[in-house]
Amino acid sequence: MPKTMWKPGTFIYPIPAVMVSCGDMEISNIITVAWTGIINTNPAMCYISVRPTRYSYELIKNSGEFVINLTNRKLAFATDWCGVKSGKDVDKFKEMHLTKQTANFVKCPMIEGSPVSIECKVKEIKELGSHHMFLAEVLAIHADEKYIDEKGAFDISKCDLIAYSNGGYYTLDKKIGKFGFSVQKKKTNKRKQKKWEKLKCSNSKGFLLYTI
């Protein structure tokens, strides 16, 4: 089927809708960011892109720190609200009834209600155009214990995380596979893998009998 061609734009969807906290425990702000992601594995690095005109831009640039807080259905309203209101005018933590949580390595607060909070240290700022990209090293990851399973792994299916796509917020549906599943060999039932055993030849009928 033919595809419709559009002019260049931002159409890589879905992407995370995160709440980035910045500043310190006294003077802090939350900026909602969709231009964010992973850029390196070792060392673990991520990025956020922010317009220089945003109130949070100077807070992040001056401190060189920020926290990425993942969002879920419960935080959807606050996520959107913190993206359309300016920290110059309102205290977003207070207005959205969000609780500040002390981080381990950075001075800016984490958001207590977030399923996962990621402490980040800015390593470089790239001025790209409409947005400046903050390249940052991940210092620590804090996951809410209620989302940790009995094996100590993070169970993302319990978080009810939200994503942003073409102007809307969406919840993640369900897991349909895991990394490498396309080349993974199917597990066979060991009970059906019993070796064939050759029995004694029947003198009367003169044939070999096999059994599974």
Which residues fall in each region the model found?
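Basic, polyanion-binding surface patches
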Residues: 1-196
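Aromatic (phenylalanine/tyrosine) cluster motif
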Residues: 207-210
